[in-house]
Amino acid sequence: MINKKIQQWLGVMILCTALLCSKDIQAQDAADSTRLYMIDEVVVTGTRNATDVRHLSQAVSVVNRKKIEQSMQPSLLPVLTENVPGLFTTARGIMGYGVSGGAAGGISLRGLSGGTARMMVLIDGHPQYAGIFGHPIADAYQSLLADKVEVLRGPASVLYGSNAMGGVINIVTRKMHEDGVHTNLHAGYGSYNTVETELTNMVRKGRFSSVISGSYNRTDGHRDDMGFEQYGGYAKLGYDITDNWNMYADMNVTHFNASYPGPVSAPLVDGDQHITRGVSSFAVTNNYEKTSGSASFFYNWGNHWINDGYTPSAGETSQDGRFNSRDNMMGVSLFQSTQFFKGNRITFGFDWFRYGGKAWTNYVAGEREGTRNDLVDKHEDEIAGYMDFRQDIGKWLTLNAGLRVDNHSRIGTEWIPQTGLAFHLPHAIELKVSASKGFRYPILREMYMFPPQNPDLKPESMWNYEIALSQTLLNGRLNYGVNVFYIDGKNLIMTLPNPNGSGMLNQNSGKIDNAGVELMAAYRINANWSVDANYSFLHMKNPVIAAPEHKLYAGGSFTKGRWSVSSGIQYIGGLYTSVGDNPVTENFVLWNLRGQFSATKWL
């Protein structure tokens, strides 16, 4: 229930909006005829059909292929951290993130973390996370996959269900847009025997298209026992059945070997991980003037082998057991979006997801050598239907509303609503207000694995209230925006003393009370020069680790002929590294300088 303060705040927003809209309605038609919108504002995240972002009431950031290539990073996460306000990812070295103890690659969006399954990564709209642990695998999200990345900041549970509670990162995979053959090789060598390679071939001929990519990356790391090695490939085949119907199939497989050396004060030995992740999908899409839709199937899987290592300085010896897991997630997604009359768009969709796996410990030494201890072997199902409604009212207002009914095989049914208004004002000003609910079901680890497990956990839920203002100036060369949000969440799962016995127990006892401001601006000075900046402030009543209070980025790029140079500086302030009675925060500054020369069309 919205408390009195939030009701008053929303009332003021709506009143201000009404005053702005009524100021000069007659003059708006003239303003509309001269307004210019950038083509990269057409998105598929936050809506199931390609939509001008102006008509959405939620905040969506787009990082295009040019930005990804300029970053010269094998992983997508660094470029997203730079370009998306409110999003922060942890890192631990030159390359690679790893899993389990000492892992980095934790993704936080407005204080909600993917590590706790409160935000989701998608590939072409399909959920991507470990079936048992429910979190994204950071090393699986490589730059070679992406044509662009869209980040929806705020709940996206109406369209994507559980785990999209705090937002989603949607990786839109690459494709060839015109006939021809394009081959690109990226190779680099640097300190600590660091090697980066990527080879991509894209083809389009008539109705057929293909993308084939492969990569190999490695480093010794800046510390002993911190090596990282990764290799993988991606393939996508597409065929235009008719002018209106298309089908494609794709597969991505990556394997990485990572080592964790422990803290400098107490080095760890044999902290090794061997991880393989795979993603595959098949989709048939249709696209007509007044209707579009898709039917798709996806299957994700992972094999994990982990040695947690030991600390000699603490008198420890090599561990007897090795952790193993096999997880998977599959699903079917159907939707059709239709325009029934002018300015209207209604989408009906259906999702079925099945996820889970098994985990066990293999004992390779000690008294239990040659035996196995099973930890979990479970699968759960989700089935959901949803409706997303959008209606233009005149030229100055778009109404958005949505509802999802989601059923979990063990927990039951959740109703997830959202609503919002987008006002298209004179002088290319956009004003948006929204209220949306996010939720997540307990993951298998919380319900069934390790001593704190609790099979009676309930879903977490939250409401996000937001107002956003943006404007485009100078014939589209300058744009800026500001977002203000408030998050009110309940039933967060926490590990606390068992109220009915000894030990610890996972319980629905936590709350979220976050508020923040996000600012962004970009200016295309001329054909060669461009600059951009973003800043986010986050206030958390209950702070969490790896969620900074202040995040600032400012950068610029210069392109001329075959040369391209870009640079950016990032400031992180109030980054929590420890919470509780004695919280600890850190600040740091990171400066990047990148240069690129295209020797040929393919190198």
State what each model feature region is.
Residues 156, 168, 173-203, 214, ...:
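Short strand-turn segments of transmembrane beta-barrel domains in outer membranes
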Residues 126-153:
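Short acidic/polar hinge/loop motifs at secondary-structure boundaries
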Residues 29, 219-226, 230, 244-329, ...:
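Flexible loop and strand-edge segments within Gram-negative outer membrane beta-barrel domains
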Residues 28-69, 77:
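Short, acidic, small-residue-rich periplasmic hinge/interaction motif at the N-terminus
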Residues 242, 343-345, 373-488, 526-527, ...:
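Structural signature of Gram-negative outer-membrane beta-barrels, strongest in the C-terminal barrel
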Residues 392-395, 486-488, 507-578:
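Gram-negative outer-membrane beta-barrel transporters
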Residues 80-126:
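Extracytoplasmic beta-strand/coil segments of soluble accessory domains associated
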Residues 264-287, 325, 378-380, 428-430, ...:
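Outer-membrane beta-barrel signature, preferentially recognizing the C-terminal barrel domain
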